[in-house]
Every structure is written in structure tokens, then in C-alpha cells.
Amino acid sequence: MNPVDRPLLDIGLTRLEFLRISGKGLAGLTIAPALLSLLGCKQEDIDSGTVGLINTPKGVLVTQRARCTGCHRCEISCTNFNDGSVGTFFSRIKIHRNYFFGDNGVGSGGGLYGDLNYTADTCRQCKEPQCMNVCPIGAITWQQKEGCITVDHKRCIGCSACTTACPWMMATVNTESKKSSKCVLCGECANACPTGALKIIEWKDITV
């Protein structure tokens, strides 16, 4: 089966492993009031998708759509910190493409989450990473020390196979460097967010 056609939850990290509970993950779970307070949202916000929860090895990235103003500071901070240059297209956190950017540019179609809808998105650090599986030279590997899947820029040939294979198209090839990049869980996006639309909550602070 083409990896893009596989169900998203089959590809992503199982929330069972992260939460150490049985049954469904955060998106379908009745969350304890104390944890909801920590996440800064209500149960109905999670159920409706207004609040997004992206599980990573280091913690949960909480995205609150209603708080996002589309200022792009998260993307700017990400690329400045990781690349030494500023560019929203090759940012590891994705905001711009989720507004009204279609496949062929501005105004050509709805964003991934609907028109006029800012939604932060980034790498899920998949348990079975399709980006890593399809890389023809093995430039994408799991790094135990960093706790994430990374791209070795010395080996990357910029073929974009990783982007095509990812169901969310998260790995992005920088058109200037010709190298692919993806989230390394540095947290700069959340640090730069002026409205609290992005938060990273470490697993040690989450109990269920």
C-alpha cells in the first residue's frame, strides 16, 4: 500500500505508548480536569479539533487554533534558530500552508484545514517513519540522544522522496540549500509564540 494512503493513526506514534494507558489516545479520551487545566483547554475543544495535540517523544505540542493570529513568528524563529536564515516555506512548523494556500499557490485552493483557518502543524515523529523508509541513501535516522528523527544534511541529496512519502508532507526541501529538514523538537516555535497558541508540555508534567 502506498504510505500516503495508509490510515494516519497507523503511521503515527501510538498514543498508548506515550500515555501509558489502554484504549484511545488524547483525541478520543475523556481528559481529567487537572490535565485539561495544564493543556489550557476544555474537553470539547479537543473533541472538535479546535485544540490540536501532537505527540512527540519529548512531550505534547498543544496547538490552539483560536489563539493563532498567523503572525508567522513561530516559522521565523524556527528557521532563524535552525538554519541561520528566515523563510516560512522551509520552516519545520507549518502555518502558512494551512490558511488559503492550495497546491498551486495563494488562492488556488483551500488550506489543509479549510480556508481562513490558521493551524500549526509539524512532524509527528512517527513510530514507523515513512520519510526514513523511502530515503534512498539513508540520510534520515532516529537519534536517541535528541529523541527525534533527523535529516543528515551531509548525506541528503534533496530528492524530496521524504516529503512525498509523509502523509502530512512535513519534511521540506530548502530550495536554496537543496537539503531536506524536519522538526528536531527544539521548542523555538513555542517560545516565540506571542499568544500562547503553541505550547510544549513535557511528559514528566503529564499524569493520567
From Swiss-Prot:
GO MF annotation, one: metal ion binding
Protein induction: Up-regulated by the oxygen-responsive transcription factor FNR under anaerobic conditions. Repressed in the presence of nitrate or nitrite via the two-component systems NarXL and NarPQ, respectively.
Stored InterPro entries: 4Fe4S_Fe-S-bd, 4Fe4S_Fe_S_CS, RnfB_subfamily
UniProt keywords, alphabetically: 4Fe-4S, Iron, Iron-sulfur, Metal-binding, Repeat
Residues where [4Fe-4S] cluster 2 binds: C78, C183, C186, C189
PROSITE patterns reported in the protein's UniProt record: 4FE4S_FER_1, 4FE4S_FER_2
One Pfam match: Fer4_11
Sequence positions that bind [4Fe-4S] cluster 4: C135, C156, C159, C162
Residue ranges occupied by any 4Fe-4S ferredoxin-type domain in the UniProt entry: 59-88, 114-145, 147-176, 174-203
Regions crossing the membrane: none
Binding site for [4Fe-4S] cluster 3: C123, C126, C131, C166
Binding site for [4Fe-4S] cluster 1: C68, C71, C74, C193
UniProt xrefs under PANTHER family: ELECTRON TRANSPORT PROTEIN HYDN-RELATED, OXIDOREDUCTASE
NCBIfam families linked: PRK09898.1
Protein name: Uncharacterized ferredoxin-like protein YdhY
Organism, scientific name: Escherichia coli (strain K12)
